[in-house]
């Protein structure tokens, strides 16, 4: 997409933040309007995260106008809201390539721009990193400002509060901005509150506040009186007691869509010492009515026609694996009142919308709190219930100690429904589900299942749910199922694989939903094909049979080769002194960048042609 200078005359003047800071302040509202329209035009053509960026246009302009970026360091949490930031920092003409193979990264990425201070993708990391960056700048004697922008969802995570608690203790010079888009701007976020924010962030108030603390620090009754008086004055309009108690100077809430007001407040706060906290209120989807009305649907969008205000409907094809899981969940809950479902803020993505409506008293969205989600599930299991934790592979990493310490060691019957396992696609390195088999396989008493299709997925969910001797995990990919017939639910024998095709000389041991590709290769090479089903416990007997009956084995999985299912097969063969050649095929030892799932699999040699080529090259 070429940039239309006539359509965006003010934005055309801004190819860097240095150029932005040369603009007269009175032109900034027009810049914000053009930036918002350009974002709509670009994302509707290319797909991507959408509603969050619409809500941070004024904040982004104000931050880069007031702070000397990239010398001053600006950190975005998660990064969904950072598209305007990318546009203003030299990547305007490439924004249409975002999330595409070889294009702009979907999130702030250190290797892409000096303006991207922290590579992100997972939530709630910004304040911790910001403290470290601020401390480093202070120790180096650099007069560098540090600003972290975090959303109202991300700030609920324990890591964010751990960081704020630490900041209150060591008191680095830094600013945390809470982008609160949970509700539309209410009346109290108006002229009075904006005036108060500028007053409280001004040098006079700050000097009086800090000077008063020094003068009266040794006089406890007066110190306490001053503190209570200050809290009383601010408490009339400022809901910031929690952040003040953590050691921050709280300012807000202020209108996050008033670019002139934001600039005034940020200029006042820029030179304040110690940890500062600015609370701004924004509207997700701001400026595009369909996104304002339905910010969840418009959070991340495919290509669409902005004039219609409608996203393209599903073609009505095969259901996704998340839908398969959600249907199984509802079906099981209707029969068993002990089922409890838990998600860390991924209701829509995990296919749990219908369940949350039908069984609200058994649905628990714990917010962005993966560690809590797992230990909460452990508590439910101790209480005699049957918890199912629906979680993305990449996010389960954040609760690894809880899986071991709070679930596995106690052999609690918690089932993990691991969505987005394997290659995820457009969200890139931070979201690929590349490691779950490796990091779960080494945990004692964990049962791990890898379905090859949607029917097997249902059977494994059923099997895991009724397994009472410890935790279980069923991992399934992002994307549509294969269209196989669904059969009545029944328990699978634990740790047993299934031979799908008998061949000669070569046996392919497949783990998971690469089965259709494996079947094509097995047919082409006249190889035996095995659906291994279980990564733990492995079917040792079947593995040894395949080794005895074939000249060579190939393992296939959409997980890191290192420590994955194939490594488990190698261990079985070595333990039994079977010197059969084995080729492990899976995800390589590097972080897989963005692109479609099909592009990634083709590039990594995980489509049928690539798998066959790998095997032939190995046999040559």
Swiss-Prot record:
EC number(s) stated in the UniProt entry for this protein? 2.2.1.7
Q: Which cysteine residues pair off into disulfide bonds?
A: none
GO cellular-component terms in the record?
cytosol
| Cofactor(s) the protein needs | Mg(2+); thiamine diphosphate
Instruction: Output the SMART domains linked to this UniProt entry.
Output: Transket_pyr (SM00861)
Keywords carried by this UniProt record: Isoprene biosynthesis, Magnesium, Metal-binding, Thiamine biosynthesis, Thiamine pyrophosphate, Transferase
Q: What is the protein's name according to its record?
A: 1-deoxy-D-xylulose-5-phosphate synthase
Q: Which organism is it from?
A: Salmonella agona (strain SL483)
From the broadest rank down, the organism's phylogenetic lineage runs: Bacteria, Pseudomonadati, Pseudomonadota, Gammaproteobacteria, Enterobacterales
Q: What would be the name of the gene that encodes this protein?
A: dxs
């Amino acid at each position: 997409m070429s940039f239309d200078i006539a359509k965006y005359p003010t934005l055309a003047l801004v190819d860097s933040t240095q150029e932005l800071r040369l603009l007269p302040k009175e032109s900034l509202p027009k810049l914000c309007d053009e930036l918002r329209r350009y974002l709509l035009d670009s994302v509707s053509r290319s797909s991507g995260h959408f509603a969050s960026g619409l809500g941070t246009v004024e904040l982004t302009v104000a931050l880069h106008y007031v702070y000397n970026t990239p010398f001053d360091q600006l950190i975005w949490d998660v990064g969904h809201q950072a598209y305007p930031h990318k546009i203003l920092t030299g990547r305007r003409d490439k924004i249409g390539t975002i999330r595409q193979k070889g294009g702009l990264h979907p999130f702030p990425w250190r290797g892409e721009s000096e303006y991207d201070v922290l590579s992100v993708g997972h939530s709630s990391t910004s304040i911790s990193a910001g403290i470290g960056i601020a401390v480093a700048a202070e120790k180096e004697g650099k007069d560098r400002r540090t600003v972290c922008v975090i959303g109202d969802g991300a700030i609920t995570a324990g890591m964010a509060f751990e960081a704020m608690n630490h900041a209150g203790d060591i008191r680095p010079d830094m600013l945390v901005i809470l982008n609160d888009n949970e509700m539309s701007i209410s009346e109290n976020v108006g002229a009075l509150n904006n005036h108060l924010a500028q007053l409280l962030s001004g040098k006079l108030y700050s000097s009086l506040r800090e000077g008063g603390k020094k003068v009266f620090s040794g006089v406890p009754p007066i110190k306490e009186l001053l503190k209570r008086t200050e809290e009383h004055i601010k408490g009339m309009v400022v809901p910031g007691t929690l952040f003040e108690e953590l050691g921050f100077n709280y300012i807000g809430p202020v209108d996050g869509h008033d670019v002139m007001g934001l600039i005034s407040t940020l200029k006042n706060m820029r030179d304040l010492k110690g940890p500062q906290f600015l609370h701004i209120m924004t509207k997700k989807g701001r400026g595009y009515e369909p996104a304002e009305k339905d910010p969840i649907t418009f959070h991340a969008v495919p290509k669409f026609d902005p004039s219609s205000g409608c996203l393209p409907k599903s073609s009505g094809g095969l259901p996704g694996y998340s839908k398969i899981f959600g249907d199984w969940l509802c079906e099981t809950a209707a029969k068993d009142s002990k089922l409890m479902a838990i998600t860390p803020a991924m209701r829509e993505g995990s296919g749990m919308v219908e369940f949350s409506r039908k069984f609200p008293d058994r649905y628990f969205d714990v917010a962005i709190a993966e560690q809590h989600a797992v230990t909460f599930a452990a508590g439910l299991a101790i209480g005699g219930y049957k918890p199912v934790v629906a979680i993305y592979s990449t996010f389960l990493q954040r609760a690894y100690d809880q899986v071991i310490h709070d679930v596995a060691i106690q052999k609690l019957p918690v089932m993990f429904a691991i969505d987005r396992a394997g290659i995820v696609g457009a969200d890139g390195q931070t979201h690929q589900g590349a490691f779950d088999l490796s990091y779960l396989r080494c945990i004692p008493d964990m049962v791990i299942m890898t379905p090859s299709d949607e029917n097997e997925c249902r059977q494994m969910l059923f099997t895991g749910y009724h397994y009472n001797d410890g935790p279980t995990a069923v991992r399934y990919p992002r994307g549509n199922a294969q269209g196989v017939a669904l059969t009545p639910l029944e328990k699978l024998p634990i740790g047993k694989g299934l031979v799908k095709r008998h061949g000669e000389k070569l046996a392919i041991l497949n783990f998971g939903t690469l089965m259709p590709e494996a079947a094509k290769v097995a047919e082409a090479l006249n190889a035996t094909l095995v659906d291994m089903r279980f990564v733990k416990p492995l079917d040792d007997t079947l593995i040894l049979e395949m080794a005895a009956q074939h000249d060579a084995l190939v393992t296939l999985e959409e997980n890191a080769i290192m420590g994955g299912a194939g490594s488990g097969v190698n261990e079985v063969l070595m333990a039994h002194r079977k010197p059969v050649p084995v080729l492990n095929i899976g995800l390589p030892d590097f972080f897989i960048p963005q692109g479609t799932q099909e592009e990634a699999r083709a590039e990594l040699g995980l489509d049928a042609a690539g798998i066959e080529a790998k095997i032939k090259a190995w046999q040559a």
